[in-house]
Amino acid sequence: MLLEEKFLEFHRYASSHNLPLEAISVGDENKVLCEMHYAANAPRNIYSHTKSFTVTAVGLAMEEGKLSLEDHVAEVFKDKLPSNPDPNLEKIQLKHLLCMSSGFGKALLMNEDRRPGVGAPDYEKYMMAQPVPVEPGSAFCYSSADSILAAHMVCLLYTSPSPRDRSLS
């Protein structure tokens, strides 16, 4: 009972001081002992959590044999390529996107690029037209664009023939 009393005491303190809490949970190695969610129905920006969802979806697609870390971005989005794509663009593989080492060399679709309209409505076409000054796989550069492209690769698998099927036709 002491744990529940201390937990409620903390809850009252947090509430009375308007602490910006999302949730609090106390558990041992086997189960949740006490838990409280604040503003559970309030929308929130989850930022980098999206990357976790994307890599999970990639893993599931790989498990089904629909996707490989070796798949090339330019092959998947070949209908979005400009007439003269950057030679390094054709070297970018899914594994580079997941490790944020695509070679774009800067954080795309972030910071000032977050304003409405940048890259929209066709992110794939926008990204395929970007210069790739760094050898893919050689340098880390945090970029939302890498995650967006990886997520779009997965989306294509479940909304149209798979990239492998398209490349065989």
Regions found by a protein language model. Name each.
Residues L33, P82, R166:
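Flexible, glycine-rich phosphate/dinucleotide-binding loops
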Residues F53-T56, A145-M153:
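Well-ordered alpha-helical segments within folded domains of soluble proteins
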